Amino acid sequence: MGSSKSSKKDKQIHPFGTDVSTFRKLSSKEKKKLDEKELKQYKKLKHKVKKLKKEERERSSIKNTKTLAEDPMVKNVAENDHDQMKNSLSRSQDKGNTDYWLAASLSGGNQRKSKFLKMLGIKNAASITESSPSAQSNKTNDKQREKELEQQYMHGVLHKGTKKGLGM
C-alpha cells in the first residue's frame, strides 16, 4: 500500500509545473484552488525560479563585461582616458589649484590667505597669495555687495512672520 501512495503523488499533475523548466505563474483564482501542500510547493518552486533567473542575469552581465574588457578597442580607449586624466591632474596641481580656490579674492591679510591655502593642501601658497590689481578693484564691488546683503537681511528680519507676499 505504501507504494500506491507514492505512485499517486507521482501521477499528480500540478497546474504550475513540477520543476523549474515547466514552471508557470498562477493567477489568484488558481492559487485559491490549491490546497496547503500544493501552495507550499508552488512557493518553493517560484523561489527557485527567481533565484535561477537572478543568477543567469549576473552571469550574463559578467560575460558582457569580460567581452568588453577583452576587446582591444575598448582597452585602447580606456588607456587613453586614463592618460588624459593623469595629464589633467598634473596640470591642475602645477597651477596650484588656483582655478578652484582663489586666495586673492579673500579679504584679510596675507597670513590669513596663506593659512587658508595650507588647510586646503595647496602647495606654493606664498606665490598665489600676492594680491593682483584685479583683486583690489573688486574690493569696491565687494563692499557694495555686502551693503546690499545687509539691507536684504534687515528687510527680512523686519518682515519676518507677517506672511506678506505668500498669497495667503
Curated annotation (Swiss-Prot):
GO cellular component: nucleolus
Secretion signal, residue range per the UniProt entry: none
Residue runs in coiled coils: 29-95
Domain of life: Eukaryota
UniProt-recorded name of the protein: Uncharacterized protein tam10
Region called Disordered, residue ranges: 1-35, 48-97, 126-168
Lineage start: Eukaryota, Fungi, Dikarya, Ascomycota, Taphrinomycotina
Pfam family, one: SMAP
Polar residues compositional bias, start-end: 126-139
Biased composition (Basic residues): 157-168
Keywords tagged on the record: Coiled coil
Species of the source: Schizosaccharomyces pombe (strain 972 / ATCC 24843) (Fission yeast)
Molecular function GO labels: RNA binding
Upregulating conditions: Differentially expressed during meiosis.
Compositionally biased spans, kind Basic and acidic residues: 68-85, 140-150
InterPro entries: SMAP_dom
